[in-house]
């Protein structure tokens, strides 16, 4: 959506072209270019005298970037955490002018890596202002909501639903009338995925979380509803949700649209203090440090009586498309004037990332310092080991066969 918004922006300083493998469904526009192959891209860049190309980061696109004309600035737009080896390649590649992260926390993780010097943060976007104009007046008052908890996301292990499933019976002990809505499924992004016997998620993952949600009779707890993959109809569920739980593992979350969406519908958030959640969750949310605090966090949130909805709306405007596209235009202005991003101010290190900032400065002054691992590398390894231990604990218990 952001490329489309940029394409429609009335900007006298830049000619913004939208490249796509099919343009027949796009509005007629002189700056809409059909690109069906790598060769099409290279030819179009030359024919249309394009100065800079924005590519969504992937190894394939990195290889494509290396074949573009040497005078073309390449901006890599990274929606996911980048592996350290790939980050080093980006840092050394002179063709790559800029790496755009979709959140400040993602950028902070690269603070003591060489790639930090060519990286900036521009938030991902959402039609916030449109939602506020058309939907905010229909949002149910928080005090009128029952104890509904909602998970919104893909049912795969790295999205952490098994952690919420494991915590659910403990939540019920404290709040007996709580109800869990699960929106999403194992086929959210892969329609060909083979599902388990419950038809909910891939078999091995389904077998990991389902035992936590079954009663003594082997049937699904009445307090749990799997809604499957939903479109606009999910609005009715979100509008009665009290606590939203997006990806309680935090793995892969550089931004999290689901957190924004649930807050727009009036829910307060309970999830781990990691990655994009630190950017996208308002102060009414509860960000815990370790997954074993999930049940405690949800119970605490369910007992709240106010969601400060007006404060939420002020907070989320930061992520509206209009604000985000302005940041992109500012980046284009800087690159046009200087050819690099040296003049763009980087966010100051947070308390958590001061060690990374010290490490960055230390590595600059010692011989071969750039070869030392970044603190991001160690933190990522620790976080993944922690998640694997929790997954192992889920599988260790002897559950009834399902």
Task: Label every model-predicted segment.
Residues 55-60:
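Short His-centered aromatic/hydrophobic patch
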Residues 100, 133, 139-172, 180-183:
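Conserved donor-binding/catalytic core segment of Leloir-type glycosyltransferases
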Residues 193-229:
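Nucleotide-activated donor-binding/catalytic signature segment of Leloir-type glycosyltransferases, i.e.
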Residues 223, 239-254:
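Acidic donor-binding loop of glycosyltransferase active sites
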Residues 317-402:
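C-terminal amphipathic helix plus adjacent low-complexity
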